[in-house]
């Protein structure tokens, strides 16, 4: 499999005293933690424990009632998701969010070109093919995303993160509903991406 080269940047995430309420329900109460460097951490808890709420705050989908989140020295808890992604945080979702009417290859290079407007399309496409080779999906490059299995959809979402090159990757239930033959690829993805300098947060 191909080696996906990444910049080895110093990563620092600081979450401090986060609180989130929905009406009278206090979902997050004074949550604090930090990540330094290429750490691999797990966020484990039962349904309703607030894992998704925390993730939604980290990626800018919702705002906390109080508390702060800093990534690489920049405050991100008041930024919209696309700005958080530019700072360096990416995530997958329990329900995959591919562009179903685009091909697998287009699903990778279109978001990357949107983020890096000045990028050369040929260079980005070549990187997308390299990513698909790493995920053993190169043979599916011209298939429409809507034709993929649930496990292949998860791999495609992981590939999109590789293209966007975040410093911190949050994987929400990455093994849920995945065929055992694809689990090995996801394990390898986590190992290599973490080994090459990315911080990984696994949610289960």
Task: Locate each region found by the language model.
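Conserved ABC ATPase "signature" region
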Residues: 109, 121-140, 188-191
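Conserved ABC transporter NBD signature motif
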Residues: 67-74, 87
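Conserved ABC ATPase signature
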Residues: 144-148, 152
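Catalytic Walker B motif of ABC-type/P-loop ATPase nucleotide-binding domains
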Residues: 169-173
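The feature captures the beta-strand-to-loop junction immediately N-terminal to the Walker
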Residues: 44-46
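Helix-to-loop junction immediately C-terminal to a conserved catalytic motif
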Residues: 59
